[in-house]
Amino acid sequence: MSRTYFGTDGIRGAVGQAPITPDFVLRLGHAVGRVLKSQQTSPASRPTVLIGKDTRISGYMLESALEAGFASAGVDVLLTGPLPTPGVAYLTRALRLSLGVVISASHNPYGDNGIKFFSAKGEKLPDSWEQQVEATVEEAAQWVDSSGLGKARRLDDAQGRYIEFCKSTVAGELSLKGLKLVVDGAHGAAYQVAPAVFHELGAEVISIGCNPNGLNINDGFGATHPEALVSAVQAHQADYGIALDGDADRLQLVDATGRLYNGDELLYLMTLDRLAAEPSEDAAPSRVGVPGVVGTLMTNLAVEQALAARGVAFVRAKVGDRYVLEELLARGWQLGGEGSGHLIALDKHTTGDGLVSALQVLQAVVRSGRTLAQLLEGLTLFPQVLLNVRLQPGQDWKASAALAEAQRESLAELGERGRILIRPSGTEPLLRVMVEASDAALAQRCAQRMADAVRRA
């Protein structure tokens, strides 16, 4: 069953255009509240939801609309103010709440916003739940009596609680003293908590992208604009740089030389660190500590091959961290992620967390006594070209004869030296054309051929 409003990461769009309007968001809050109450085992109890947001100026408006919608359905609300998405997931679980809600459009510019939800366990909710919400949104509202209206209040020290949680995901004796770090908060949800986490663990911290004004989230800073981080690391002669996106659920990492490390490399490093912590080589055949790793259709082939060489199973999920999580839960595995920097370590958190992931990487560096580059010496990624082609309204790229022909030509040219992946974005009107090959020029040539075919269609 298709969904009208929900994409791969909640509901997202331009502010002021359906569905990111105050009236729809109020209806959405009301519908979600009704769904929550219908699932209660005890009708006498009242659900409580947690609402967090990033730093977009539209967050104030949408927060108020959601709050009103929930209250009108008889649901209580706790408000955190600006807080990373994984912080909302953590607090929802830690405080035994009914639902977590995040108002954010992640890495998108400030003119966009979105809403996503977490279960009481701090996990992203399945498609079936979203379909139930969409059906309820279309029904007539069922306002509760005044005596049954929900209440709203601010949650004290939400940021401090999350900071302590992040620190708890690494060994108690871990110290980052002696490390100079540049931390880029993307002018987003982590602008206060990110520098604090690393500072409290002993690092010298230089903050950039930590001065939000409501209009500058992701603007020239953050995980989608790592050039700012590279420049700052080199200017300050820092050891490493850490860039988060607007809601801090993913990261980019830079070393002292300015080299960028993507999510594929960091996922492999996290796997190596856990393998190194296994009690003996006798455990290698079963890999009790790391039986398998989940990537996506976009994960670099070199990672799959390197894991196989170490006896670690690898499975590809659909693109999107929610699908990585579903695969991990189904298999009982712990580690998964995407090249974009969404990394999941279920032994640490229930969802992807840029700060927690960065701490896992730094912990591996500190306790090994080696640099990040040295730890990854055995991994050489295949050249991968990703082109984003904007689709016109109503454009049916699947029916394009020109694209089909360009794809046939590219497959013939690649042979067994590479692979092709063409897929639409789940959040924007874009077609993503990815080619991975043993030769960079070959990958670029094939990707450009197919992208040009889409533009001509």
Curated annotation (Swiss-Prot):
Q: Report disulfide bridges, numbered on this chain.
A: none
The transmembrane residues are none
Its family? Answer: Belongs to the phosphohexose mutase family.
Asked if the record carries the keyword Magnesium, the reply is yes
Q: What is the enzyme's class at the highest EC level? A: isomerase
InterPro entries in UniProt? A-D-PHexomutase_a/b/a-I (IPR005844), A-D-PHexomutase_a/b/a-I/II/III (IPR016055), A-D-PHexomutase_a/b/a-II (IPR005845), A-D-PHexomutase_a/b/a-III (IPR005846), A-D-PHexomutase_C (IPR005843), A-D-PHexomutase_C_sf (IPR036900), A-D-PHexomutase_CS (IPR016066), Alpha-D-phosphohexomutase_SF (IPR005841)
* Cofactor binding mode and count: Binds 1 Mg(2+) ion per subunit.
Recorded catalytic reaction(s): these are: alpha-D-glucosamine 1-phosphate = D-glucosamine 6-phosphate
Query: One GO biological process from the UniProt record?
Result: peptidoglycan biosynthetic process
Q: What does this protein do?
A: Catalyzes the conversion of glucosamine-6-phosphate to glucosamine-1-phosphate.
Q: Which domain of life is it from?
A: Bacteria
Q: What is the lineage of its organism?
A: Bacteria, Pseudomonadati, Pseudomonadota, Betaproteobacteria, Burkholderiales
EC number in record: 5.4.2.10
> Which UniProt keywords are given for this protein, alphabetically ordered?
Isomerase, Magnesium, Metal-binding, Phosphoprotein
List-wise, which residues carry Phosphoserine?
A: 106
Q: Which gene encodes it?
A: glmM
Q: Which cofactor does it need?
A: Mg(2+)
Positions contributing to Mg(2+) binding:
106, 245, 247, 249
- One Pfam family of this chain: PGM_PMM_IV
- Which modifications occur after translation, per UniProt? Activated by phosphorylation.
| Keyword Repressor in annotation | no
GO MF assignments: magnesium ion binding; phosphoglucosamine mutase activity; phosphomannomutase activity
Quote the catalytic residue positions.
106 (phosphoserine intermediate)
Q: What is this protein called?
A: Phosphoglucosamine mutase
What's a GO cellular component annotated to this UniProt protein? cytosol
